[in-house]
Amino acid sequence: MNDLRVEVAVGDRMLEQWRYVHNVIVPPDELSADEVRERSGRNRLENVYLGDELVGCSTVRPPGAEDGVATVIARVLPEYRGRGIGAALYEHCLAHARGLGARHIQTVVLAANGDGVRFAEARGFVEVERYVAPEDENEVWLTLRLGA
């Protein structure tokens, strides 16, 4: 997959691309442009391209000072899944999180996203928490930790 490219989302155009992918994959947690800009100040947001085509995005939340837990989230648009893009993106994000000094890695997945849950479990993530979003009692989220 030589034409796969991961770029840090900087500037309005790239942040809007990141927001598009996020909102397609996580519609219950749709983000505004302002929310994405705020997140970009505290997390590493990246876009993934296959050639010139936007195919996914990622988030790496830096490890907490006390617990050393970093959060890695890889998102691939449905029409591009099953091609190894998610695996390559995940490995890229994992390396970045470890480079930040993460002692533990976790991910967060909407429980209704069966593809995302299976992807995480296939890579050794284990569910450690299940919670309901405060604004929508039908929105169940999973926190999964690598090698928990």
Predicted regions and their residues:
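Short acidic/glycine-enriched loop/turn segments that link adjacent beta-strands
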Residues: R42, E66-G68, N113, E135-N138
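Conserved catalytic-core motifs of GNAT/GCN5-like acyltransferases
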Residues: Q106-L110, E121-T143
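A short, internal acetyl-CoA/4′-phosphopantetheine-binding micro-motif in the GNAT/acyltransferase core
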Residues: I73-R81, V109-L110
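Short loop/turn motifs at secondary-structure junctions and domain boundaries
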Residues: V36-G41
